[in-house]
Every structure is written in structure tokens, then in C-alpha cells.
Swiss-Prot record:
Function recorded in the entry: Toxic component of a type I toxin-antitoxin (TA) system. When overexpressed kills cells within minutes; causes collapse of the transmembrane potential and arrest of respiration. Its toxic effect is probably neutralized by an antisense antitoxin Sok RNA.
Xref: InterPro entries: Hok/gef_toxin
Pfam assignment, any one: HOK_GEF
Main location (coarse class): membrane
Keyword rRNA-binding set for record: no
GO cellular component, one term: plasma membrane
Localization in the cell: Cell inner membrane
The name this protein goes by in its record: Putative protein HokG
Listed transmembrane segments: 5-25
Protein origin, superkingdom: Bacteria
Membrane topology reported for the UniProt record: Single-pass membrane protein
Organism the protein comes from: Escherichia coli O157:H7
Keywords assigned: Cell inner membrane, Cell membrane, Membrane, Toxin-antitoxin system, Transmembrane, Transmembrane helix
Family listed: Belongs to the Hok/Gef family.
Length: 50
């Protein structure tokens, strides 16, 4: 039963991150969230075509 809730929580978290990424689109270069003793950091690295 606990694993069912854990799986649902992971799916919800992934959908939230995916939705946020789609909303900000091209302007996302770095996202940093700090809460208590944890830090979550996502960095988008790319090379633009010239």
C-alpha cells in the first residue's frame, strides 16, 4: 500500500516538473529550489546554432 502511494507521488512530481518546464519554455536556464536542508537544482545546457 505504501509503494502505491510512493509511485503516485513520484508520478505527480514528474508531471509537475514537466508542466513547469513546458510553461517557462525557452527562458529556463537554471532552476534552483532550496528548502530546509535540501537543494534541488536543474540546469539546461545547450549550444545555439549559428
Amino acid at each position: 500500500m505504501l509503494t502505491k502511494y510512493a509511485l503516485v507521488a513520484i508520478i505527480v512530481l514528474c508531471c509537475t516538473v514537466l508542466g513547469f518546464t513546458l510553461m517557462v519554455g525557452d527562458s529556463l536556464c537554471e532552476l534552483s529550489i532550496r528548502e530546509r536542508g535540501m537543494e534541488f537544482k536543474a540546469v539546461l545546457a545547450y549550444e545555439s546554432k549559428k
